[in-house]
């Protein structure tokens, strides 16, 4: 998969909290944790779960997640 965003942080999901509409995802990147809020639908479509390897994609206005 190719993507134009240059700020990509590979990590592992350490926590995911599913709300009615949104999902709060915590990703361990080295010694740090990146927090992301995405739609619940996106989390379900990606089948995100604790322990999954993901890439946090940081843009100036948002943080997206990509699952390999």
Each language-model region and where it sits:
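Non-catalytic connector elements of ABC transporters
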Residues: 1-68
């Amino acid at each position: 998969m190719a993507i134009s965003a240059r700020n990509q942080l590979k990590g592992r999901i350490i926590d995911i909290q599913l709300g009615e509409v949104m999902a709060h995802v915590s990703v361990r990147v080295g010694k740090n944790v990146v927090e992301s809020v995405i739609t619940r639908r996106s989390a379900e479509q990606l089948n995100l779960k604790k322990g999954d390897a993901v890439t946090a994609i940081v843009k100036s206005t948002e943080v997206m997640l990509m699952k390999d």
